[in-house]
């Protein structure tokens, strides 16, 4: 009887630790909708859709490989682009995560924020160029 109580207690602790440590960002959906800022205002218009499964998976892989920082960040200007995942079979946003994307002043890197999760990252040049090309269809150095 005592062994059962110890087993249940250890199992409970283990489950709490596992659940607490799974704070990963889940990118669900098979399409990405991209919006671009209009002028200097905080208004956005439809810009691009990424529907190719391979490209969507590449974007998911990049976003999942990022070491996000837990930080609430206030940027000087509104994001240059916003994007989110959608599931075309459900016709709605999959998880409600909206990624805000800024192009750094040196134009060689991008910064991403997930405001609802208080996540921030400043990507290196290689990942910035790859992600930007996949999302917008343009080279980062051409913007």
Give the residues covered by each predicted segment.
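Sec-dependent bacterial lipoprotein signal peptides
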Residues: 1-21
């Amino acid at each position: 009887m005592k062994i059962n109580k110890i087993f249940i207690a250890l199992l409970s602790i283990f489950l709490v630790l596992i659940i607490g440590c799974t704070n990963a960002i889940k990118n669900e959906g098979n399409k990405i909708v991209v919006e671009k800022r209009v002028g200097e205002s905080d208004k956005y218009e439809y810009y691009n859709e990424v529907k190719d499964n391979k490209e969507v998976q590449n974007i998911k892989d990049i976003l999942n490989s990022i070491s996000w920082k837990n930080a609430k960040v206030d940027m000087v200007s509104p994001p240059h682009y916003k994007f989110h995942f959608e599931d075309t079979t459900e016709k709605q946003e999959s998880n409600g995560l909206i990624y805000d994307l800024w192009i750094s002043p040196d134009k060689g890197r991008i910064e991403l924020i997930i405001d609802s999760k208080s996540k921030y990252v400043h990507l290196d040049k290689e990942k910035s160029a790859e992600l930007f090309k996949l999302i917008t269809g343009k080279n980062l150095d051409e913007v």
